[in-house]
Design a protein with these regions (language model features):
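Intrinsically disordered, metal-sensing/regulatory segments
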Residues: 4-284
Length: 284
């Protein structure tokens, strides 16, 4: 079992630096058994909930334009909460595990901004070439949403893998159940823009895997080679990606006719999305 330790370092002038390790335990050795175990966890936390959320698609296809704007705005609310949640998790990692020499808060801000700018440039190129690359604009937006959610789920996988690796069974179980319930809303975020296109089953499965499968890779990295620095980087990249997707959806709503984003559907949709995510976060 994991045991607490205090690790100290004394330098030439007698100054001593100490750090308490709450639960020191041998690192997991990568093997097929543990790899399969983490893959099952990642599937349960990432892929299955996203696929369940995609079941909203037939319903959204039948609704009116104003209700469609509501669901697009709902997507913004869901994603905004995820982006803020990613930054909060990154700050927690900085406070608990990262040396002050990394200047963690500035690292988070810089990574979020660079991620936002890089992915925004990529998405603009993608949406501007929708005709030449034979992909519809709704599908392009859904793809960017899937990528943003996938980066966020990678960070969730890191947290779960690290908890399992430390032997924190109760905490890791809480994370698995909590993230699984929380992530069922993510499929809805992907389904909303797709409802105005003609997605095939293959495309839906592909987008679901892009959004959910990174949880598996995150669990592998977190369980076998957890690094606080890399965790902060990936969580921050995920936040930047999510904020970039929010901007894309806002532009999409404006192009759909709500130029000032001031309609009741848009305002209530964003508020409802935030409320849904908040309630699921405190219930679990």
């Amino acid at each position: 079992e994991a045991e607490p330790y205090i690790i100290g370092l004394t330098i030439d002038d007698g100054t001593r630096f100490e750090r308490e390790i709450e639960a020191a335990a041998p690192a997991l050795k990568p093997d097929l058994e543990f790899a399969g175990f983490f893959a099952i966890i990642g599937t349960y936390v990432g892929i299955i909930p996203v696929m369940i959320g995609l079941l909203w698609l037939p319903f959204i296809k039948k609704i009116s334009k104003s209700k469609y704007h509501f669901f697009l705005a709902l997507t913004i609310g869901l994603l905004l909460f995820l982006g803020i949640d990613s930054i909060e998790e990154a700050i927690d990692v900085v406070d608990e595990n990262l040396s002050g020499s990394f200047n963690g808060n500035l690292l988070i801000a810089t990574t979020v901004i660079l991620s936002f700018l890089g992915l925004y440039y990529t998405s603009e190129k993608l949406t501007s070439r929708v005709d030449s690359i034979r992909i519809s604009k709704p599908a392009a937006i859904a793809l960017m949403i899937s990528i943003g959610i996938g980066l966020h789920n990678f960070g969730e996988g890191l947290a779960i893998g690290a908890a399992v690796g430390l032997g924190s069974i109760a905490f890791s179980t809480f994370l698995i159940v909590g993230f699984a319930l929380h992530n069922t809303t993510e499929g809805l975020a992907i389904a909303a823009p797709l409802s105005r296109g003609k997605p095939t089953i293959g495309k839906l499965l592909g987008l679901g895997l892009i959004a959910g499968a990174p949880a598996i890779f995150g669990a592998w990295v977190g369980g076998f080679a957890f690094s606080p620095f890399s965790s902060v980087i990936f969580l921050s990249i995920g936040a930047g990606a999510i904020f970039q997707v929010i901007v894309i959806i806002l532009k999409w709503i404006r192009e759909e006719g709500d130029s000032n984003l001031s309609s009741a559907a848009a305002a209530s949709g964003i508020a409802t999305g935030l409320l849904i995510m908040y309630l699921t976060s405190i219930i679990i």
